[in-house]
Amino acid sequence: MSFVAGVIRRLDETVVNRIAAGEVIQRPANAIKEMIENCLDAKSTSIQVIVKEGGLKLIQIQDNGTGIRKEDLDIVCERFTTSKLQSFEDLASISTYGFRGEALASISHVAHVTITTKTADGKCAYRASYSDGKLKAPPKPCAGNQGTQITVEDLFYNIATRRKALKNPSEEYGKILEVVGRYSVHNAGISFSVKKQGETVADVRTLPNASTVDNIRSIFGNAVSRELIEIGCEDKTLAFKMNGYISNANYSVKKCIFLLFINHRLVESTSLRKAIETVYAAYLPKNTHPFLYLSLEISPQNVDVNVHPTKHEVHFLHEESILERVQQHIESKLLGSNSSRMYFTQTLLPGLAGPSGEMVKSTTSLTSSSTSGSSDKVYAHQMVRTDSREQKLDAFLQPLSKPLSSQPQAIVTEDKTDISSGRARQQDEEMLELPAPAEVAAKNQSLEGDTTKGTSEMSEKRGPTSSNPRKRHREDSDVEMVEDDSRKEMTAACTPRRRIINLTSVLSLQEEINEQGHEVLREMLHNHSFVGCVNPQWALAQHQTKLYLLNTTKLSEELFYQILIYDFANFGVLRLSEPAPLFDLAMLALDSPESGWTEEDGPKEGLAEYIVEFLKKKAEMLADYFSLEIDEEGNLIGLPLLIDNYVPPLEGLPIFILRLATEVNWDEEKECFESLSKECAMFYSIRKQYISEESTLSGQQSEVPGSIPNSWKWTVEHIVYKALRSHILPPKHFTEDGNILQLANLPDLYKVFERC
């Protein structure tokens, strides 16, 4: 038998590239991982993934990142082409995900790749197709959004053995969901979505404003999210920092869920997982495991990222010392959280006057059983199919209103100083012009009959932005100026500096609101999903599995009352475009049947003169505490700004002026502020008599599909009910007086219809 030496031949370049591609791209999930990392390197804030047949037939990933320059499209799919690395020494300080320039090249050698991309300075997008790393044809201009869309078709079409090994699309799709879910947890603040082609509902979806815990809840369920412990430690000697979330002793699953990111790379570490599970062995039942999400940031020069083709392994210095430090920190956190067990109770809402549905904590719980992840299966009749945090495009499409005045109204910025008083007084920097009194009068005269007219609507244009919107500088004996970070979003309290009120009467009114508040109702309003308006007085909202009918009039009235009390003396001003004579407004009110005027009360002119003189005496207090401004001639020139972008129905202005003079208790301080705030809240509330329901005439909708909805409906949904989420503590009597009614409950509907 003769031994003949074999001939060494140089492999064909296509064979070499295909072998290398098989190492880097082992399955569809690896391809998606590489492309997601490219999206993150491109500073994307939204990443959408669409797959077909587990990614073997189609993978489409789209981002809104920086895009790819047209000049780079020729070589973008060639091996060892990258924008993130220039020299080997750069690996010591690499901070991006990609560095070898192999991902797209490897994919193009085992699939058909099409790239559509547009940069910020590009006039249009460009589309190019690739095969074996080469451009098939010159890039073609096309329409497209900012960012990049990569389409991968027929993955492993030229590797028959690999395609046969990956014959289970469901398994591959599950691994894709796992990869995207893990990246979405680590990259809170970036929106991720994954769905099958042709499906309308995404299987993984995170919101751009969601926190890490929110994303864990969305991906792994409520059972783990409510049992999390936040961890974090830093060791400058070892040059590392760690943060993350781990489950406490209440939670356990049959298989360990371990999310490990080292310098923001999704990696695996068997030694670290075993070290942590050793700690949990003392707390969890046998054969059960914890949930772990850890993010380690180690000095880049101490990490070697170039040790595996798929980059799922890294090596780093001082590994044993770092593992020991992490193990000690987790053990200390678990030791401090093992003194209690948590149970949850649920009651009907809003059946009781007192708070319910609260978490019950027991301190004698070392012997209680652990919560199992498998026991939290959500059945169809218990599934909540809405998310209160979702936003609608309608919120950004504010309907154009028909102004009462022929003159265009605008938001103007004023900066005044009171020189005569010897102290600078920067007042009402953000003002809103309102219609002239003549139009208000004409509008109200048309309201005297039975015909209901629409609310006064305004066309608003934003003027120059002030550096300190609605800031009011005052120096009084009973107030002081402080920085305030609370209640920032909607009310007049969102000022850089606000006045702290030391008036006992106001503090007492605030305390009464707190004592009468219903926490469960507040939670319901905070997390509700708005369904729609029945009419100006009633609206539908969903909370969890229940549908509620809400009295918009009463809720908005309570909302404005609480804003007036809590933000007392901290309001901006809605400036009228022309001064409104109080005499004319009072006469309009007395002419209205709603005033209840009779001849026995005396001549209307005399009563109107009395109202003008009376309110002029109170003008200084009204302007200081309520931003209700009356000039020396007896003209109304400003109203308080309670909620941004909200203007009260001016048809109610005459009655409001009349009731200020007749229904407010001006003798006692507390009663004065309370009654004045209630009258003002009534004027600002959504009232049916001041809104025209053209859309419900004869029971038919007048709105054309695709048209802008009625402005009052937009205001109710996107201004009033948005404010209800965070600026109201509903009183307990709302559970009994019919202002909040439960109409339906999903489990009860299932008993009747046996389906959803």
Curated annotation (Swiss-Prot):
Q: What does the UniProt entry list as the effect of changing N38K?
A: In LYNCH2; decreased mismatch repair activity; no effect on nuclear localization
Q: What is the effect of changing D631A?
A: In LYNCH2; uncertain significance
Result when mutating P603R: In LYNCH2; likely benign; no effect on MLH1 splicing
What residues does ATP bind to? Answer: N38, D63, T82, S83, K84, R100, G101, E102, A103, L104
Q: Where does the record place the region Disordered? A: 355-378, 400-491
Q: What is the effect of changing I655V?
A: In LYNCH2; likely benign; also found in an endometrial cancer sample; no effect on MLH1 splicing
What this chain does, per the record?
A: Heterodimerizes with PMS2 to form MutL alpha, a component of the post-replicative DNA mismatch repair system (MMR). DNA repair is initiated by MutS alpha (MSH2-MSH6) or MutS beta (MSH2-MSH3) binding to a dsDNA mismatch, then MutL alpha is recruited to the heteroduplex. Assembly of the MutL-MutS-heteroduplex ternary complex in presence of RFC and PCNA is sufficient to activate endonuclease activity of PMS2. It introduces single-strand breaks near the mismatch and thus generates new entry points for the exonuclease EXO1 to degrade the strand containing the mismatch.
Please state which protein family the record places this protein in: Belongs to the DNA mismatch repair MutL/HexB family.
The name on file for this protein is DNA mismatch repair protein Mlh1
Gene giving rise to this polypeptide? MLH1
